[in-house]
Amino acid sequence: MKALVIAATVCACGGKPAPRVSTTTLVVHVTDQAKAVAARVMLVDATGAPVHIGTLDVYKTRQGGGACAIAPGVIGSWDGLVLGYGVAEVPVGVDACTPSPAIPYGHYKVVAWRGIEYDRWEGEVDLSADRGRVELAIPLHHAWTPHGTMAADLHVHAFASDDSKMPNQQRVIAQASMGIAVIGLSDHNTAGDLTAEIHELHLDDVVTSISSDELTSDTLHLGVYPVRRGSGPPASKIWHANVDQVFQIAHSFPGNPIVQVNHPRFRVTALYDQAGWDGVSWPPPFPLAFDAVEVLAGYTAFNIPSDRRFDDSVRDYYTLVDHGHLVTPMGNSDTHDFTWVLDGSARNYVYVDDARTNPFDEAAFIAAIRARRVVATTGPWLDVEIAPKRGATPTAGPGQLVTADAGGVWVDLRVERAGFVKLDRIRITIGGEHGPELAQTIDVPPDVPSFGWHGRIEVGHADTWIGVTTDGDTPLPLEQTGWYQREKWKHPGVTPFAIASPILVDADGDGRWKRGDADIAVPKR
């Protein structure tokens, strides 16, 4: 890479401006088993402060369009470098960013990460002046691998949202750096996708995009996907539409898209809160015309003693399932910028037969969401398999059905986590005689990367379901999740939580699952 040159001083040759030249270049190589991977790299100076790059341009509190394209495929953001390819040559001391220099000459601590599947890497680098090319190798360690899934963030904002303004290419790089494979671009009342930007960045083999639209009204937000780019009514017909009208608009899109309720416990523009639902009474005071709901939503991604927002969201969701309203539990970031809520801070792992992004089997991916084949998480991996009895095959996973054996089933669980994710418990909930009931709480030993549990769970002889969650009370690192919880609400931060889509149990063995409004044939496997 050629040295960056910027006119600054005056030389002795005729009084012409002399160029300022960066005399040190940071050459980064982030790898997973020697293969370059997109990632984030934060530099921390001698005072312990992170190097902030760019400006806070959205309401003077958030960074949307104020980041700096500091090098090809590299975004200089408020919390560090965002590397789209894992390999980069970044100028130090002199650059075209505002303010400049983005990275002053000096000695830095380095922290690198790639979403939640990898352990953090920490080291040091000397970027003093006149050091030339400074090589920095960052080998990341995969803490866990979600086999047979695609990581998806299906509620994401970019340039077309007036409260984001992040350039679309930067959104692609940001998502790729956090290990997301499927992006649902869901700008407010705008149907769009990121396919063109992904192709321009040559990231087709890494990430793909689904065209989505977040229908945004005063009372609720609905995600609709996949939709045709540029389709949908004008925003003026949606802003002040009532709940019934917004659902009607959602179902007017051709092709029977997924209708997803976004952040229903956000307190504002939140369906459950606006309707005054307590999460238990039935029927709820709103239409049930949706396929999926954000149980883990980026702006409400926490449990604290005074506000167990995750637990409330799971309670709401289990009430729906218990009455036979089988919708998919989703986890999406709702990211708007580079500061408040970050890409993939809540995400989905969708079980698919073909996990490639190029080509991408969109129809199969959407079918998997509709079939509830999802684990949603803000940090840990949660594997759930259920069989009629110990050793029986095949087993049932998230969203599937199993037949009980003499009023019980055999449950195999495993939680895995990166080192920065602290877990405390696993909870198993079943549909009881009078509604959802906690069947078992299992303590997770501290500081173990992988923990398994198995045992028989009694379910009785009426058709039911089994839901499993895992969570912890220690917040995740703010630089990895964003600063919204602390800056806006003075909360410690995002806490780790995962939910597997419940497994249905044919307890009476009649070949059908009947509970509430549902009557479903148990497929032969």
Predicted segments, located by residue:
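Residues embedded in well-ordered beta-strands within globular domains across many folds
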Residues: G184, E294-A297, L504
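A metal-dependent hydrolase metal-coordination microenvironment
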Residues: R120, S128, H141-G279, P305, ...
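C-terminal motif of bacterial Sec signal peptides marking the signal peptidase cleavage site
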Residues: V10-A12
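Bacterial signal peptide processing site
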Residues: G14-K16
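C-terminal functional module detector
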Residues: R20-V21, H29-T98, P104-P139, A143-W144, ...
